[in-house]
Amino acid sequence: MDETAREPVLVDLALQGGGSHGAFTWGVLDRLIEEPWLKIEAISGTSAGAMNAALVADGWTQGGAEGARAALEAYWRRVSQAAAFSPLQRSPLDRMMGRWTLDTSPAYIAMDLMARVVSPYDLNPLGLNPLRAVLAESIDFERLARAPIRLFITATSVRTGRGRIFRNKEITADVLLASACLPTMFHAVEIDGEPFWDGGYAGNPTLTPLVRESARVTPFWCKSIRANGWSRRARQARSSIGSTRFPSTRR
């Protein structure tokens, strides 16, 4: 059957947070967008999923499906290039063994311990975040405001613990940074005088607007639902706890 002649299928996408999940989701989205019959109506995203959502919508507005694919690739390559200068690198042994983990990286272990006792306001008093420059280079927020793909980006209010959903015209670099703001690593991001943390604490991702406003579409939920497993090691145990607690999809 000629795929170009196939009847279009409207879909909503729900994209979870987590840096590595976000990179994986890039590959999933790249493959989905290749299909000419698939039409994206709306995307709900949190944290890294919020970045992917904004990239798809902005890229699509500029150049259709190929524009969305190009925007995703350009962003993740910029992130990768920026990470090349980070002190958080795999240990020589991990490189030799072909393991993609930071669990034995001295810099990562030191940062992990430091983050438990020292506030990011002390470690990084200026609140610098290299991701801000990457976002500014990757997304045209004025164009995003008029994108045909509707966006629902979640961030968590520090004061109330409730999620706030931002739509296309409200989305700025601050909104995306707020959606990905881990409180042990970054300053809370203020929006309209209100401090926000990572959206994953309230909805990872939020499904409510997709269900209420897009009744005729097929939902496509891209998130990890498999825990890391049971371990006797402290760091892996904390990771498992986070994997169990953080995917708090709000329906």
Feature-to-residue mapping (PLM):
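Patatin-like phospholipase
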Residues: 1-44, 54-251
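Gly/Ala-rich beta-loop-alpha elbow adjacent to hydrolase catalytic centers
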Residues: 45, 49
